[in-house]
Amino acid sequence: MLSRSSFTSLAVGVFAVYVAHTCWVMYGIVYTRPCPSGGAAACVWPYLARRPKLQLSVYTTTRSNIGAESNIDLVLNVEDFDIESKFERTVNVSVPKKTRNNGTLYAYIFLHHAGVLPWHDGKQVHIVSPLTTYMVPKPEEINLLTGESTTQQIEAEKQTSALDEPVSHWRSRLTLNVMVEDFVFDGSSLPADVHRYMKMVQLGKTVHYLPILFIDQLSNRVKDLMVINRSTTELPLTVSYDKISLGKLRFWIHMQDAVYSLQQFGFSEKDADEVKGIFVDTNLYFLALTFFVAAFHLLFDFLAFKNDISFWKKKRSMIGMSTKAVLWRCFSTVVIFLFLLDEQTSLLVLIPAGIGAVIELWKVKKALKMTVKWQGIRPKVQFGASNDSEKKTEEYDTQAMKYLSYLLYPLCIGGAAYSLLNVKYKSWYSWLINSFVNGVYAFGFLFMLPQLFVNYKMKSVAHLPWKAFTYKAFNTFIDDIFAFIITMPTSHRLACFRDDVVFLVYLYQRWLYPVDKSRVNEYGESYEEKPKKKSS
């Protein structure tokens, strides 16, 4: 059976292979092999190299397929379209009755020769995108005491929201790109991701690909959606354009496919939106750094969970450990998980919080020496007795909590009362969870003081799970970076920086009380807690 060090080495090795493989895959995505100079017959040449005069036209229709210019509306026409110049224009779009009744409205974007109608141009390229999507409206927040709402919504919208059913929303942004590189493809090995966006034409003896028109679906964010009701007749649409390189185009196609796959696996529109935000709102170079940071975060999460579980699994006594701090960590972790769940936070944050809550519940069972015996169908919970050494630790623990309660309880109660009077919530449950979590975030570090006090009284920190602490500290510093990237509640973001301060205090105590693991303390125990070897 693998030892702990071997298992850790194996995990780190697998992690290194994973990172190397991912880097190789990413290189394969952004790098495209050009057509060799000697194989001109098999090359696919760019039509844009001829520098044609182009025009951009955007139409809307309720039909997913159009054969001619009937039943379509022209909403934007850009003559003398320059593929090198970015622009952004806002137009008003008429909303048909069919769309107002939860129907779909499509945008047809044509790139064609200037002065020629799209359906009369044999070398036009076009792409289709729905301008509507279906999503459950965000619950309205009200003042729980007065019933005053944050927004004056139309009564029909309130009734629709109450049904908790998806309704039609308007995508107010349309982001377009054209691949502008004069890149010569090898016809025998066209990249599959780009190939589906390419349209070929035969010009003389050579094959050319027409301009590659692309819609950036990653820019469609939940914050830009607008609810469509029966009285809506016109809505704004912001059309923006920018050129794109081949490498970024291929990367963006893969990211869009990944987001689509997440939605097929059950991710909601909001969950997918969190992932989109990582790519759209972040510089690509910073995004590459974020990938490596996220990979290390995953590794440290795994190692922290593993070492924490290993430490508590072998823990035979609570000497030097604050039981109340363990109980508090369990309570705060569960409350934070429920809060993140209520706020519909990204699964990237929610899943680790849920795993952490389960581990903290198990640690409480170990700390209280709790056993469950079944008497028929009725469970009977029993708690183990504490020895004299553990009672001494509990005495320090109780002493710290006594003074702490004088400060903590008034602050938490006052904060909850203030938020009830001045802040609007979706429900009483939402207020209760928010009050708890604000207490956890704002004053939670105070509950770490009992453990610091126990360390001070015992003049030792050898009883703490330092390996798990170290991995968690690394993740805390990584969380500081993610706090500016991943969408999360502001209080959760501030808590990341609070944990930095707490860990620095633990480091100071470790320096102040050097650990001698071979030393037997005043209770006759070694903090190494090595299992006794059986005599042969």
Curated annotation (Swiss-Prot):
Assigned keywords, A-Z: Apoptosis, Endoplasmic reticulum, Glycoprotein, Lipid transport, Membrane, Transmembrane, Transmembrane helix, Transport
Annotated localization: Endoplasmic reticulum membrane
Membrane topology of this protein: Multi-pass membrane protein
Reactions listed under catalytic activity: a 6-(alpha-D-glucosaminyl)-1-(1,2-diacyl-sn-glycero-3-phospho)-1D-myo-inositol(in) = a 6-(alpha-D-glucosaminyl)-1-(1,2-diacyl-sn-glycero-3-phospho)-1D-myo-inositol(out); 6-(alpha-D-glucosaminyl)-(1-octadecanoyl,2-(9Z)-octadecenoyl-sn-glycero-3-phospho)-1D-myo-inositol(in) = 6-(alpha-D-glucosaminyl)-(1-octadecanoyl,2-(9Z)-octadecenoyl-sn-glycero-3-phospho)-1D-myo-inositol(out); a 1,2-diacyl-sn-glycero-3-phospho-(1D-myo-inositol)(in) = a 1,2-diacyl-sn-glycero-3-phospho-(1D-myo-inositol)(out); a 1,2-diacyl-sn-glycero-3-phosphocholine(in) = a 1,2-diacyl-sn-glycero-3-phosphocholine(out)
Alphabetical GO biological process terms: apoptotic process
Signal peptide: none
GO terms assigned for molecular function: phospholipid scramblase activity
One GO CC term, this protein: endomembrane system
Pfam families in the cross-refs: CLPTM1 (PF05602)
Glycan-carrying positions: 92, 102, 229
Protein family according to the UniProt entry: Belongs to the CLPTM1 family.
Protein name in UniProt: Lipid scramblase CLPTM1L
